[in-house]
């Protein structure tokens, strides 16, 4: 979610208004919340979607892996008389917090919350100087650990695959040279180096550090793996007719969601070079258009919405399929866990 420049005010749900929920009308149209329905918001953040779902009369189970978001959301919990349950959890574990086959909807907003972007000490933004952390929770390796310890070849893989950065080799070798002199500690250390080795051209629309910061954040938090596991989990907790709604912000995430819904449509995916594959029972059917993007008006008023894409599916009565990560064709980035140690 994107921070509200005004900040400081509160909404009807009792929580702070610090964000603009992206594609809110489209999310609600696809999710169809109503009294008597139970919806899981897997990415609570600043509570934008949850607040709107509650306003429609539904009950909500909301998850967030960030303890700061959970603490900030307690006022919203108190304001809704038992209709909101807020849980500190990664959304990949959503099946642990919902009845199997008992949900009417699941919504996931795959992005960094306003609270994380606003706090320099979290290290998510190159626009604010702070420690190179980028962890959405307090566990695991930090972005600084990755930069200071990973092999150059592994940095190139991270920047290229997760950030789609064309200058990955140049940046990785510059990082190797710089860390031999002094370890990376702050966001300014990294952003400054990237600006130095890949000067921004007049035609460029984004800061040269954008893709590297994105890649590090995704790697540190295993965001693609989390998303894939959440999609599989949602398939098990949605009742027939339940809706899965996912909002993504870059092409890697969108490809995962698109691949999942395409696969779960049950169509055979054989090749003319291989034996014919049998069609499977569909576990999801499409809801509305295959992909929805922001209107011109929303993109104008909320720049973050320009890259947002929404995909939604409706659960059928077919049995959930086994989770198979090979569906997405991820490279083995998990092998970087030791960071060259």
Curated annotation (Swiss-Prot):
Cleaved signal peptide residues: none
Entry keywords, A to Z: Cytoplasm, Methyltransferase, rRNA processing, S-adenosyl-L-methionine, Transferase
Subcellular location(s) of the protein: Cytoplasm
Catalyses which reaction(s): cytidine(1402) in 16S rRNA + S-adenosyl-L-methionine = N(4)-methylcytidine(1402) in 16S rRNA + S-adenosyl-L-homocysteine + H(+)
Residues annotated as binding S-adenosyl-L-methionine: 47-49, 64, 91, 109, 116
Domain of life: Bacteria
Keyword S-adenosyl-L-methionine: yes
EC category: transferase
BP term (GO), one: rRNA base methylation
Similarity remark: Belongs to the methyltransferase superfamily. RsmH family.
Protein task: Specifically methylates the N4 position of cytidine in position 1402 (C1402) of 16S rRNA.
Protein name stated in the entry: Ribosomal RNA small subunit methyltransferase H
Organism: Rhizobium etli (strain CIAT 652)
Organism ancestry: Bacteria, Pseudomonadati, Pseudomonadota, Alphaproteobacteria, Hyphomicrobiales
């Amino acid at each position: 979610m994107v921070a509200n420049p005004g900040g400081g005010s509160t909404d009807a749900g009792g929580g702070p208004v610090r964000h603009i929920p992206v594609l809110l009308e489209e999310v609600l149209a696809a999710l169809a919340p109503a009294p008597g329905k139970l919806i899981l918001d897997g990415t609570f953040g600043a509570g934008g979607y949850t607040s709107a779902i509650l306003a429609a009369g539904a009950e909500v189970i909301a998850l967030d892996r960030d303890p700061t978001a959970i603490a900030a959301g307690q006022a919203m919990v108190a304001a809704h008389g038992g209709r909101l349950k807020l849980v500190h959890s990664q959304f990949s574990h959503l099946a642990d917090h919902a009845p199997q086959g008992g949900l009417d909807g699941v919504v996931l907003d795959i992005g960094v919350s306003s609270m994380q972007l606003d706090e320099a000490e979290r290290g998510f933004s190159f626009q604010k100087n702070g420690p190179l952390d980028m962890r959405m929770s307090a566990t695991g390796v930090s972005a600084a650990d990755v930069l200071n310890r990973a092999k150059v070849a592994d940095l190139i893989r991270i920047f290229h695959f997760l950030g789609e950065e064309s200058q990955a080799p140049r940046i990785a070798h510059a990082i190797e040279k710089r860390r031999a002199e002094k370890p990376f500690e702050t966001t300014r250390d990294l952003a400054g180096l990237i600006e130095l080795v890949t000067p921004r051209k007049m035609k460029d629309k984004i800061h040269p550090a954008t893709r590297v910061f994105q890649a590090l954040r995704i790697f540190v938090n295993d965001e693609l793996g989390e998303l894939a596991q959440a999609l599989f989990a949602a398939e098990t907790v949605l009742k027939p007719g339940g809706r899965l709604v996912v909002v993504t912000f870059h092409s890697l995430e969108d490809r995962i969601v698109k691949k999942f819904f395409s696969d779960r449509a049950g169509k055979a995916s054989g090749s003319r070079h291989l034996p014919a594959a049998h069609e499977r029972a569909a576990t999801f059917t499409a809801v509305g258009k295959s992909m929805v993007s922001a209107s011109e008006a929303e993109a104008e008023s909320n720049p973050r919405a320009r890259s947002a894409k929404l995909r939604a599916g409706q659960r059928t009565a077919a049995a959930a399929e086994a989770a198979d990560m090979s569906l997405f064709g991820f490279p083995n980035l998990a092998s970087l866990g030791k960071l060259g140690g």
